[in-house]
Amino acid sequence: MIWHVQNENFILDSTRIFMKAFHLLLFHGSFIFPECILIFGLILLLMIDLTSDQKDIPWLYFISSTSLVMSIAALLFRWREEPMISFSGNFQTNNFNEIFQFLILLCSTLCIPLSVEYIECTEMAITEFLLFVLTATLGGMFLCGANDLITIFVAPECFSLCSYLLSGYTKRDVRSNEATMKYLLMGGASSSILVHGFSWLYGSSGGEIELQEIANGLINTQMYNSPGISIALIFITVGIGFKLSLAPSHQWTPDVYEGSPTPVVAFLSVTSKVAASALATRIFDIPFYFSSNEWHLLLEILAILSMILGNLIAITQTSMKRMLAYSSIGQIGYVIIGIIVGDSNDGYASMITYMLFYISMNLGTFACIVSFGLRTGTDNIRDYAGLYTKDPFLALSLALCLLSLGGLPPLAGFFGKLHLFWCGWQAGLYFLVSIGLLTSVVSIYYYLKIIKLLMTGRNQEITPHVRNYRRSPLRSNNSIELSMIVCVIASTIPGISMNPIIAIAQDTLF
């Protein structure tokens, strides 16, 4: 009898929760229509996996890619609409948030074709891989529009949990397991630090959780210059620094990059940076508006450390993925310049533009690494020697992406850095910009060192991996080459037409 009553209560509670969720989706679903498309794609993937055999694998890729493209289309159709707040103030929709969501969707759309051949060759579970990628994308999109502390915590955890699972996807690989453990432990610690900072912010504002209400609460309680806010700022900066791989919270990055499957590294290297940058711009600009001098100083120190350590340590690396890990630490230091400049002097516009170029440069480089790794089984930089003699297309593609990452003209990376540094210079960040310029020169050195190896023709320097290299057919349907071509074009041509891109980015400001 007691069990029967408990069962009825459980059914009633479940029904109430379902009806409340249905009510929210019915009246607020239009605000998260791009996210709803991804959720529908996730459900379709699960249904197909449960009801079909291995012959329907192409459908899984098609559904994943289509749901991402449709989400991008939904975002573009909603462009220039008035800012809206939904879900009782938990979610905000505006152009600024939507362009970060667009960048995350773009990353995922390019990463799926980049992963197809790798998954087939390594015999990884396909459905779970795609589910984790789409769920992480969904978490990143919700993070971009998060308007309260609870959503800001839950959304990145959704992204992070999928990232942990993806990094350890090759379970038989000891390095992958090690990378997952380090990522999980350090990620959990950083989340705890972030939440501790949120608790100080919550208490100081008089119990508010919405970002704008926190700022108003700090004025009402006159706590905006209190020691509690300084403590909150330090803890939140450390937590966000981990998500961005800012020094000194960068220790996890090289190990995770080296141990994780290469397509996973490509995905994490860009999506995590975009999502965390969206979080940083909103949380520093709104609740910490009255502490702008303090967080500017904190971010300047972290950016300088990241640019110097990232680029100097990258010189000594022998693994291509570890080199790109340290390179990404330096690259995010450049992005921080745009966050510090902010609305004034087009800081956010230059940051968004550079992140768009960084996505194409980084994913193009990883596409080349995936292609080379599948044919040779190595990740050592020395083993790339003489690649041009065997596969000129792959060698030239990798060279162009690396040169663009280094910021050599007339490639997109040069114009992106130029505009970013110019905005920083106009804002008076002379020392920070000078460090950025010097470390960019350092980065060009180790990129050119790799390009020199690629183009060498001396037999004594060519390794057995390149001698036995199997080049794919010219008319191949290789999906990696599709991603590679798109990224290489995006890393070279857009730099020439910077003005329209900057103009679009300027329209995304608050």
From Swiss-Prot:
Cellular component, GO annotation: chloroplast thylakoid membrane
Main localization, broad class: plastid
Pfam short name (any one): Proton_antipo_M
Residues passing through the membrane, by range: 24-44, 57-77, 99-119, 124-144, 149-169, 183-203, 227-247, 295-315, 323-343, 354-374, 395-415, 418-438, 484-504
Keyword Nucleus carried by entry: no
Localization terms from the record: Plastid, Chloroplast thylakoid membrane
Topology relative to the membrane: Multi-pass membrane protein
Entry GO MF terms: NADH dehydrogenase (ubiquinone) activity; quinone binding
Name of the protein in question: NAD(P)H-quinone oxidoreductase subunit 2 A, chloroplastic
Organism, scientific name: Ranunculus macranthus
